[in-house]
């Protein structure tokens, strides 16, 4: 909503018929569905808005425009309507309409109406809606519109040029959103949010630059930077479907850098895919720009979203389960990286419901060519991003410090994950904090690289410690209006105990490690064993309650508080019990029968 969607022209070119796709966005309560018009992505190289459509399966080569491929490179047209797994062959994939309609019929017991269905909170009569956005009303005096480069259900996109001010005679792209199409309060709010996101995030090196927003009685105009280097999708196809490993690294680093910035600001993109990254120029070394925030949203650090939105080949399992957060973007980056390295989609099926089923149930293939020739670090990197357990995925910043991408000269950004983990550590039991400290002593260099970088970003005091003020200062130095809108700074209120104490690097390592993430690394068994042996001093492969008390420096009077963590039969804690205990699960709770 509040986005531009291109319309497919029913015509043929070079004997190949154009494919129609219809996008559906299901809202969080599960009983509203909005079909959008068929999509045609105009292949003009100068619009950042053509991927504003959240269509799960855009056709890589729409009709009506010249091929974006370099001279001498021919596209590989699909010969049938059956979707293919290999990314180097464009194809017209299916619409998710049938799958989502069937789900609604099952849920509601009735067939949903055809056409747009107003969302529950936006059922007001159109005449009662306030469509005044407060934007400038002098668009014609400031900008000159050029040719149309894309059209869709809510509006269209044009190239243009500035007529005055800092961007006089500067090429621009203008997204024009029709107010007549804003028939619900939700649609109006979506436009406000998209403009707010673009305005507050603009300025990052790898994010589309926002210039202005205007309106008149009929339309809203969003003025943005014009990128004429084409999409990442076009470059992939021009290279035969995949990138050499070193070239893929350069692309992935740019993607992770801009996504980590968005996540720190409390913004989840929700539609990361090759079509939503534009190159600034046709040069091979030109920068990437992230575009299309039409499906993006603000999110608090501990919030979970439940709207099913995005593109099917890139959607994370937890999105289909209607409970997701920033980790959903990481999954999408994993899919993009998989495609860059091998030229095929990790999750593929002939039908839309089959695509969702493979995302939920199957694992990507790492055995076929070219995976055997890929580096072990590259393969591990993709596996860490495409872990179906979102808790075990790396964050965007952690991915930048992975051995596959590590570069000591690269500046590592601040990670919001650090704040979440330290908050959990401060609220943990003394026994669990002691166990985390034991684990921290066994961390490998791969984990310590990330932790050192984050600790230094907090600006340690002269004595090498950090406190709540350090966490606050570091966060505010990176704050934008988006961060305030997403209420990210509120997490500092849950870390108040740090205002009265200091945290040195050794304890910071214990506080800033995730047990779930450690379980996904190859060295997990060695790390966990080292932590277990820190408590188990008698060499009998179990931890006694006396050993726990000695580690915590408590007397026999405190034994009663420790019995939840040991076996009731013999008062001991095994290695298996220790690993459960690291997750905060007591043995008594683990063995309790549900009533």
Curated annotation (Swiss-Prot):
Binding site for Ca(2+) 3: 540, 547
Region feature Disordered, mapped onto this chain: 1-131
Domain Protein kinase: 143-405
GO cellular component terms listed in the entry, alphabetical order: cytoplasm; membrane
Annotated region described as Calmodulin binding (CaMBD), given as residue ranges: 428-448
MF term (GO), any: calcium ion binding
Oligomer status and interactors: Binds calmodulin (CaM) in a calcium-dependent manner. Interacts with GLN1-1.
Induction summary: By abscisic acid (ABA) and during leaf senescence.
Organism: Arabidopsis thaliana (Mouse-ear cress)
Keywords tagged on the record: ATP-binding, Calcium, Cytoplasm, Kinase, Lipoprotein, Magnesium, Manganese, Membrane, Metal-binding, Myristate, Nucleotide-binding, Phosphoprotein, Repeat, Serine/threonine-protein kinase, Transferase
Basic and acidic residues composition bias: residue spans: 111-124
Activity regulation description: Not activated by calcium. Autophosphorylation may play an important role in the regulation of the kinase activity. Stimulated by magnesium ions (optimum at 10-15 mM) and manganese ions.
Sites where the protein binds Ca(2+) 1: 461, 463, 465
Binding site for ATP: 149-157, 175
Modification after translation, per record: Autophosphorylated.
Binding-site residues for Ca(2+) 2, renumbered to this chain: 502, 507
Sites of Phosphoserine modification: 311, 353, 574
Cellular compartment(s): Cytoplasm; Membrane
Protein name as it appears in the record: CDPK-related kinase 3
Region (Autoinhibitory domain): 409-439
Active site per UniProt: 271 (proton acceptor)
UniProt EC number: 2.7.11.1
Gene name, Swiss-Prot/TrEMBL: CRK3
Catalytic activity annotation: L-seryl-[protein] + ATP = O-phospho-L-seryl-[protein] + ADP + H(+); L-threonyl-[protein] + ATP = O-phospho-L-threonyl-[protein] + ADP + H(+)
Domain notes: There are 3 contiguous domains conserved in the CDPK subfamily: a kinase domain, an autoinhibitory (junction) domain and a calmodulin-like domain. The autoinhibitory domain (409-439) inactivates kinase activity under calcium-free conditions.
Membrane topology summary: Lipid-anchor
Family, as annotated: Belongs to the protein kinase superfamily. Ser/Thr protein kinase family. CDPK subfamily.
């Amino acid at each position: 909503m509040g986005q531009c969607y291109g319309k497919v022209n029913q015509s043929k070119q070079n004997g190949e018929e154009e494919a129609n796709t219809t996008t559906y966005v299901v809202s969080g309560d599960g009983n509203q569905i909005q079909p959008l018009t068929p999509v045609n992505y105009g292949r003009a190289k100068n619009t950042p808005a053509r991927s504003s459509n959240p269509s799960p399966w855009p056709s890589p080569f729409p009709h009506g425009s010249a091929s974006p491929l370099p001279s001498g490179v021919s596209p590989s047209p699909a010969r049938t309507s059956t979707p293919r797994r290999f990314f180097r062959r464009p194809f017209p994939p299916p619409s998710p309409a049938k799958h989502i309609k069937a789900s609604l019929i099952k849920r509601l017991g009735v067939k949903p109406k055809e056409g747009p269905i107003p969302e529950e909170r936006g059922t007001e009569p159109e005449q009662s809606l306030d469509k005044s956005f407060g934007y400038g009303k002098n668009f014609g005096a400031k900008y000159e519109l050029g040719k149309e480069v894309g059209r869709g259900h809510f509006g269209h996109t044009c190239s243009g040029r500035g007529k005055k001010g800092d961007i006089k005679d500067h090429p621009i792209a203008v997204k024009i959103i029709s107010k007549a199409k804003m028939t619900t309060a939700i649609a109006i709010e979506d436009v406000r949010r998209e403009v707010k996101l673009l305005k507050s995030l603009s300025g990052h090196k790898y994010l589309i630059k926002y210039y202005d927003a205007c309106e008149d009685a009929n339309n809203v105009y969003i003025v943005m930077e014009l990128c004429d280097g084409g999409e990442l999708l076009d470059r992939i196809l021009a290279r035969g479907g995949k990138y050499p490993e070193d070239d893929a690294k350069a692309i992935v680093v740019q993607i992770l850098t801009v996504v980590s910035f968005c996540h720190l600001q409390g913004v989840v993109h929700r539609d990361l895919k090759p079509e939503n990254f534009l190159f600034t120029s046709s040069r091979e070394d030109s920068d990437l720009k992230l575009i299309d925030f039409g499906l993006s949203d603000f999110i608090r650090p501990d919030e979970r979203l439940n709207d099913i939105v995005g593109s099917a080949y890139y959607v994370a399992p937890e999105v289909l389960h209607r409970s997701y957060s920033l980790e959903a973007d990481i999954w999408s980056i994993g899919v993009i990286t998989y495609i860059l390295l091998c030229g095929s989609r990790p999750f593929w099926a002939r039908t839309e419901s089959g695509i969702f089923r493979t995302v939920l149930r199957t694992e990507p293939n790492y055995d076929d060519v070219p995976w055997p020739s890929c580096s072990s670090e590259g393969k591990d990197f993709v596996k860490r991003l495409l872990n179906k357990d979102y808790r075990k995925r790396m964050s965007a910043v952690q991915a930048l410090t992975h051995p596959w991408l590590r570069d000591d000269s690269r500046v590592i950004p601040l990670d919001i994950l650090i704040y979440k983990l330290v908050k959990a550590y401060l609220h943990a039991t003394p026994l669990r904090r002691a166990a985390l400290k034991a684990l921290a002593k066994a961390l490998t260099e791969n984990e310590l690289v990330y932790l050192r970088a984050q600790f230094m970003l907090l600006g340690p005091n002269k004595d090498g410690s950090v406190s709540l003020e350090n966490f606050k200062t570091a966060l505010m130095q990176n704050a934008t209006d988006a961060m305030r809108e997403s209420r990210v700074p509120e997490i500092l209120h849950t870390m108040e105990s740090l205002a009265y104490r200091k945290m040195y690097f050794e304890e910071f390592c214990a506080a800033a490690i995730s047990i779930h993430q450690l379980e996904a690394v190859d060295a997990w068994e060695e790390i966990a064993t080292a932590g277990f042996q820190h408590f188990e001093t008698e060499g009998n492969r179990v931890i006694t309650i006396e050993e726990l008390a000695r580690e915590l420096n408590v007397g026999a009077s405190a034994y009663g508080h420790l019995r939840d963590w040991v076996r009731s039969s013999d008062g001991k804690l095994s290695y298996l019990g220790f690993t459960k205990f690291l997750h905060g699960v007591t043995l008594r709770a683990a063995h309790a029968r549900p009533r």
